[in-house]
């Protein structure tokens, strides 16, 4: 499968920004900074401009990879996978974040269709909120992501999304992924206010050599987004140098 994000580590700014002027400023200030590996495009721009137009505007600013996060695609009827993937392919994104919590068939359909279309599926299944799982008062089984990972690997997925807030879970998932996938890529998400830190999460995911971070407000909310991205990348470098 194509590797969308180059290298072994880096920052992927999450462009969940309502104003296009703000988005443009963030991209212009971060696109050439060391360690910025791509961008996550979310629904805020897409609902305003449409997916194809949002991607076009972003392509005018950078040639870095674009990963589309439909907040979160995958928990849907499996037959929607063909339609959804075709539209994303036509819009010229590079990868898709998928949380196929609707069951094994959803994993097969959404991940499988992405691969067949030449898009890279980044598969996850847990978000960093306290009451997501049953043990915290939520509705999802606590081992939902464990089950999704097994099915995703069966479908030849090798890019994964892990929440950054729980060190023990990151260690367990990363070791399992590394033992079952050749040269996997892991993106960690949920930093700052959501409880994750670069230092802790990157050290916890050390079983997987290729580690990236999707970071939103720590970058987009900064008066100097480029400097904020650079600081986070230096934190990554320090973790890997100390390993």
Segments predicted by a language model, with ranges:
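Hydrophobic faces of well-ordered beta-strands that scaffold small-molecule active sites
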Residues: 9-15, 37-41, 66-70, 96-98, ...
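Conserved N-terminal beta1-alpha1 strand-loop-helix module at the mouth
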Residues: 1-67, 75-78, 90, 151-157, ...
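Active-site-proximal loop/turn and secondary-structure-junction residues that shape catalytic pockets
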Residues: 17-19, 43-47, 72-74, 100-102, ...
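Alpha-helix-loop-beta-strand connector modules within alpha/beta enzyme cores
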Residues: 51-70, 112-126, 173-191
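Conserved anion-binding
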Residues: 8, 75-168, 181-186
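A C-terminal functional module that forms or caps the active site or interfaces directly
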Residues: 164-219
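Short, well-ordered alpha-helical microsegments
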Residues: 23, 48-55, 104-107, 168-174, ...
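Short, solvent-exposed amphipathic alpha-helical segments in soluble enzyme
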Residues: 28-31, 56, 112-114, 175-179, ...
């Amino acid at each position: 499968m194509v590797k969308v994000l180059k290298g072994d580590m880096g920052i992927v700014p999450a462009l969940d920004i309502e104003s296009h002027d703000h988005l443009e400023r963030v991209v212009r200030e971060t696109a050439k900074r060391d360690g910025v590996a791509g961008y996550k495009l979310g629904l805020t721009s897409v609902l305003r401009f449409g997916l194809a137009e949002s991607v076009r505007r972003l392509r005018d600013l950078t040639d870095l990879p674009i990963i589309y996060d439909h907040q979160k695609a995958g928990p849907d009827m499996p037959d929607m996978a063909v339609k959804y993937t075709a539209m994303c392919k036509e819009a010229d994104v590079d990868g898709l974040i998928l949380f196929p919590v609707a069951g094994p068939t959803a994993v097969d359909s959404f991940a499988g269709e992405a691969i067949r279309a030449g898009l890279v599926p980044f598969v996850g299944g847990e978000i960093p909120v306290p009451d997501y799982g049953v043990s915290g008062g939520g509705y999802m089984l606590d081992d939902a992501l464990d089950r999704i990972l097994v099915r995703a690997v069966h479908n030849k997925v090798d890019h994964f999304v892990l929440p950054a807030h729980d060190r023990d879970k990151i260690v367990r998932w990363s070791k399992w992924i590394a033992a079952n996938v050749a040269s996997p890529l892991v993106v960690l998400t949920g930093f700052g206010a959501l409880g994750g830190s670069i230092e802790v999460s990157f050290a916890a995911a050390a079983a997987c050599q290729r580690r990236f971070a999707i970071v939103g407000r720590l970058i987009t909310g900064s008066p100097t987004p480029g400097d904020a991205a650079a600081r986070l990348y230096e934190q990554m470098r320090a973790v890997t140098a100390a390993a």
